[in-house]
């Protein structure tokens, strides 16, 4: 049985997510106490479909369906690994790794292309509306605003359907694992030669009233330490997993 999210692109993404689950399970040591990889992947697939199907009819728009597909995949991978291995930190690490492996490639190239084309990224964002773009792209279950100054643009997320999904399913601590995917594009921006760096001083998932993404014009950004509340949060349990002796 294949995953059916009602969107062919997201169906393909689900296929690659499950493929990456299998690869990650096969990479782990034989003594990790896990069952056959194909069996666990089948359970993740079935769990994902059950969670998604239970919610899809009540969703307000197709964009919410995409959000719930992502979240259902992450939730199922986390819960099935945790149930089998009795290892919560390991389950967080597994779900986070597989999610990032699945999505980081397309984002990496899109952000790099944007930075190559645009000499003054903050100026570009000042003339454009990030809030309008994301509102159209993410749908009515999300709420966005923006703030602009001469040298900075701030994207504000006032309502997050991703976090609400995990709250509703009793796993609010999973949201920062999903949020950590934003580090992919944030780090690309921060390391690029263009005069722009990012900050994320607050998120809803870490107790803030909103998620704030700052895009700051900075010609002297080299060596500046990242400002990211999620990066700090993921250094603490339950997210911080013990080092895997089989890595490296």
Question: What residue spans do the PLM features occupy?
Answer:
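Short, solvent-exposed loop/turn elements at beta->coil junctions and helix N-caps
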Residues: 199-204
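Amphipathic interaction/junction segments at domain boundaries or subunit interfaces
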Residues: 69-75, 79-175
């Amino acid at each position: 049985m294949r995953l059916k999210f009602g969107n062919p692109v997201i169906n393909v993404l689900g296929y690659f997510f499950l493929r990456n689950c299998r690869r990650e399970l096969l990479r782990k040591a034989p003594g990790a106490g896990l069952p056959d990889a194909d069996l666990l992947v089948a359970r993740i697939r079935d769990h994902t479909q059950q969670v998604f199907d239970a919610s899809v009819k009540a969703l307000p728009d197709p964009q919410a369906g995409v959000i719930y597909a992502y979240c259902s995949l992450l939730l199922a991978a986390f819960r099935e690994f945790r149930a089998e291995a009795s290892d919560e930190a390991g389950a967080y690490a597994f779900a986070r790794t597989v999610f990032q492996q699945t999505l980081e490639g397309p984002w990496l190239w899109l952000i790099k292309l944007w930075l190559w084309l645009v000499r003054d990224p903050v100026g570009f964002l000042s003339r454009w509306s990030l809030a309008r773009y994301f509102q159209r792209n993410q749908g009515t279950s999300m709420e966005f605003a923006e703030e602009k100054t001469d040298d900075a643009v701030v994207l504000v997320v006032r309502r997050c359907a991703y976090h609400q999904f995990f709250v509703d399913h009793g796993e609010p601590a999973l949201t920062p694992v999903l949020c950590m995917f934003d580090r992919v594009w944030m780090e690309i921006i921060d390391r690029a030669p263009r005069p722009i760096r990012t900050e994320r001083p607050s998120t809803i998932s870490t107790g803030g009233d909103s998620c704030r993404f700052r895009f700051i014009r900075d010609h002297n950004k080299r060596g500046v330490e990242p400002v990211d509340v999620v990066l700090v949060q993921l250094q603490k349990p339950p997210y911080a997993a013990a080092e895997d002796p089989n890595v490296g």
